[in-house]
Amino acid sequence: MRAITGDRALDSIFFGGGTPSLMPPAVVDRIMTAVRRGWVCGEDIEVTLEANPSSVEAGRFSRFVQAGVNRFSIGVQALNDPDLRRIGRLHTAREALSAIETAKKYADRVSFDLIYARQDQSRLAWHAELSQALALAPDHLSLYQLTIEDGTVFGRRHQAGKLPRLPDADLSADLYETTQDLCESAGLPAYEISNHARPSRESRHNLIYWRCGDYVGIGPGAHGRLTVGGKRRATHAVSAPNDWLRGVETGRADHEQATVLSAEDQAAEYLMMALRLREGVVLSRLHALSGREPPEHALGGLLEDGLIWRTDDRFGTTPRGRMVLNAVLRELL
């Protein structure tokens, strides 16, 4: 991989997918040693590790920091035990609160996530829960509105009748507005549809995705995007862990596939990602990736409807537009 990427410096490392906090910290230490041996790493590199808030995993936080981790992203999802059980989480609310405090003790940067628009959730209940989360003084929050999609865990649970009494569209919109208002007032404005941060505390790693930057995906089933020789490629490693490991150990190239992205693919990908961001689409970036401009008639209609804003060098979605992002994208693609 080092031979392909060349002398590029690393800005971010992200241990995610599955439950990386189950790894022994010594494994993280060996990975970080190998990374520093192969690439240039800046002094302010962001090293994030996703973690569950169980007491066992939280007990490893100090050793993860010693291994080089400087940011934790904790999968909390709810701050009360009944809802945690409803969504199938094994930790308790007390463990979640303890894990957040432990992470803040050792790491400079801590994020955690919550899911809202859950069963029987009222606007008042969400206001109280989010206020409790903000009182923990995080510098970053990921707040995901529960959506039901086919093929997902929640989709299967919904089809099986295990998610009754979900909020309707009007209440879901009210919950979204409550989220934006509370976080803005607390100094954590939304920089992306579901992500809120204090200034300069945004997730640098996720911004690379949303800005369509280059990133290397390592591990079974990992995806990546790499620009080599002026061509942007989508990479995908084989999903079976044993097959992936054999490919790495034997140096076989077929354990990872790479597809050159067309100009149309790059335009669609950038629009889908950048319109999630408050900063919006940079027109020069869109042109550099795909050689195309957005359709003027579509921009005009969306602007008139109050779904986008526009300046000389960029455009983006308004809060209303982000609520109906799929409709905005249909007009532009």
List each model region and its residues.
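Minor-groove-contacting beta-hairpin "wing" of winged helix-turn-helix DNA-binding domains
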Residues: 314-319
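C-terminal scaffold of the Radical SAM
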Residues: 1-290
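Charged substrate- and nucleic-acid-binding regions of tRNA-handling and nucleotidyl-transfer enzymes
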Residues: 281-283, 297-300, 310
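Short, amphipathic alpha-helical interaction segments positioned at domain boundaries
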Residues: 320-333
